[in-house]
């Protein structure tokens, strides 16, 4: 059985401002230490369902539950916690930590946006797979679609946006 430990999520979610006495007292009472950086690689659901003739049981087994919980709780508390879901950022983050000793708030916010997009795309892949495999029952009320950025473009959008086609 898998279990999500409240103390672990609490370590990510705690508000660290000294004037938030309630959070500080709860952390001390439960022996919770704050976490500054969370790195999560979700179960390979999309890679699993891309295999020919994948069994439903294999697909279901590769739906991550605890990982998205960790990602979302860290992303929500980006004022204090950095969340990394993309291994391409590892070297850049290590460089920042060596130089500054921490990740700057604007970078943590950018990582949080990427993390929420990552879990949304992950959940979209699950819904789309299940909708194609299990044809009976109610249809989800929302239509979900997720696209990966293919490249940056120089022209094609409003001045304050960054144009990029999606695949």
Question: Residue ranges of each PLM-predicted region?
Answer:
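A short, charged helix-loop
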Residues: 40-58, 65, 69, 73-100
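Glycine-rich nucleotide/cofactor/substrate-binding loop typically near the N-terminus or early
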Residues: 7, 11-12, 16-45
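Solvent-exposed alpha-helices and their adjacent loops that cap or buttress functional pockets
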Residues: 7, 27-33, 52-53, 63-64, ...
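Single conserved hydrophobic/aromatic residue that forms the stacking wall/gate
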Residues: 1-10, 15, 160-167
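Short coil/turn connectors at secondary-structure junctions
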Residues: 11, 32-37, 57-60, 66, ...
């Amino acid at each position: 059985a898998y279990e999500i430990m409240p103390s672990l999520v609490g370590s990510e979610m705690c508000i660290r401002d000294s004037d938030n006495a309630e959070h500080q007292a709860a952390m001390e009472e439960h022996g919770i230490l704050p976490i500054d950086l969370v790195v999560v690689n979700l179960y390979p659901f999309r890679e699993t369902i891309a295999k020919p003739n994948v069994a439903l049981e294999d697909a279901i087994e590769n739906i991550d539950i605890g990982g998205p919980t960790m990602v979302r709780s860290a992303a929500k508390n980006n004022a204090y916690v950095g969340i990394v879901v993309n291994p391409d950022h590892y070297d850049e983050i290590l460089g920042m930590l060596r130089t500054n000793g921490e990740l700057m708030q604007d970078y943590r916010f950018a990582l949080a946006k990427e993390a929420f997009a990552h879990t949304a795309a992950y959940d979209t892949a699950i819904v789309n797979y299940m909708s194609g495999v299990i044809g009976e029952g109610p249809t989800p009320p929302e239509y979900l679609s997720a696209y990966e950025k293919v490249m940056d473009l120089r022209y094609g959008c409003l001045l304050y946006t960054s144009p990029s086609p999606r695949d």
